[in-house]
Amino acid sequence: MEWEFNSYYTLIAATLVLLVGKFLVKKIKLLRDFNIPEPVAGGLIAAIILFVLHQLYGVSFKFEKPLQDAFMLIFFTSIGLSADFSRLKAGGLPLVIFTAVVGAFIIVQNFVGVGLATALGLDPLIGLITGSITLTGGHGTAGAWGPDFEAKYGLVGATGLGMASATFGLVFGGLIGGPVARRLINKMGRKPVENTKQDQDDNADDVFEQAKRTRLITAESAVETLAMFAACLAFAEIMDGFDKEYLFDLPKFVWCLFGGVVIRNILTAAFKVNMFDRAIDVFGNASLSLFLAMALLNLKLWELTGLAGPVTVILAVQTVVMVLYATFVTYVFMGRDYDAAVLAAGHCGFGLGATPTAVANMQSITHTFGPSHKAFLIVPMVGAFFVDLINAAILTGFVNFFKG
């Protein structure tokens, strides 16, 4: 029996997940020590409860997926609207280095997936599905490549396997990022910081770095900000249809990001509009939390248990590889400092899961140890935009090599 939740009940369920997550993180020291994001903590509890209900009583729940997608698009729009070109210039060489590090990891991820799949007697394409298609690419990329593999190469169940693998990555990307960064930070001897009210006021315009900071916004600024969000979403809808017909078939969230960047910089440069970053920050962080909560509510653990043993082995090895790469490559190449540790947490997030997971990982660290402007400048831009272009190019090369 399946119970369907409409958008209202889905929103209620997501907020309950967030409240449970907040309570758990507040009460359980282990979750705080490992910097587990509140949506991940609450979402996993919800997923386990839904799994038990399914196994014992055959009950499943269907939550409103378009609402989850909408919050994801709003989150990426907020990243674009926060991307002032004058700030992006500050990315400089670290932005280039991090992009190269991420690109190299995509290649490593696919070699690990294909190598293990071949060794275990599976189709190499399954290695790509348990590689960067689902782990770096996420659910959107899995949904795009899965039907293609089924239609062109007869790989039965590719889409379902892709969805399950992407879900695995989303969960573990949120679980490993905090512990990896915390271990690196502890080694350098950095201590947790006290976030005083004065600190919060001084840093009020730093977007996404501390989701729990109090921000003062007005009804007027909220309406103006909502108008910009609506314009970006409309732009993304138009470009998504045009893109599928004539261009590269990029995910819609890329167009949300791009639209936000364009609108932000045209308004500030050409019309001298004073952007109200605090309102953008509030909408972006709220959307991020709700997206993650809904994604985990839609997690069907019984589908993960249905994964073949070899596929589970591949995904487990990929998780270990991500931890090692973030620790010994990402952290080292980005400078072996606090910013590098936060970047490593972010890389774990979108290297296995998605950019929202990366941001949640970094927020859990900066809330404890203080801000990292560099990480919050670089990770959203690379994770939301550059990584999809690089991943598409690398995947095309791998597929052509094995099936060309």
Which residue stretches match the model-derived regions?
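Juxtamembrane and boundary regions of transmembrane helices in multi-pass small-molecule transporters
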Residues: G115-L122, A166-D206, V320, Y325-Y338, ...
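Hydrophobic transmembrane alpha-helices of secondary-active transporters
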Residues: V17, L44-V52, E64-G92, F258-L267, ...
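Entry/N-cap segments of selected transmembrane alpha helices
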Residues: D84-V114, L226, V282, L297-T327
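C-terminal ends of transmembrane helices
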Residues: V20-R32, S78-A90, V180, I263-D277, ...
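Structural signature of hydrophobic alpha-helical transmembrane segments
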Residues: E2-L16, K62-F75, L125-S132, L247-G259, ...
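Flexible hinge motifs at transmembrane-helix junctions and intramembrane kinks/re-entrant loops
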Residues: L24-V40, Y57, F61-E64, R183, ...
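Alpha-helical membrane segments and immediately flanking helix-loop junctions
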Residues: L116-L161, F168, V180, K197-D199, ...
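Intrinsically disordered, low-complexity non-transmembrane regions of multi-pass membrane transporters
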Residues: M1-F5, L11, L18-V20, R182-L226, ...
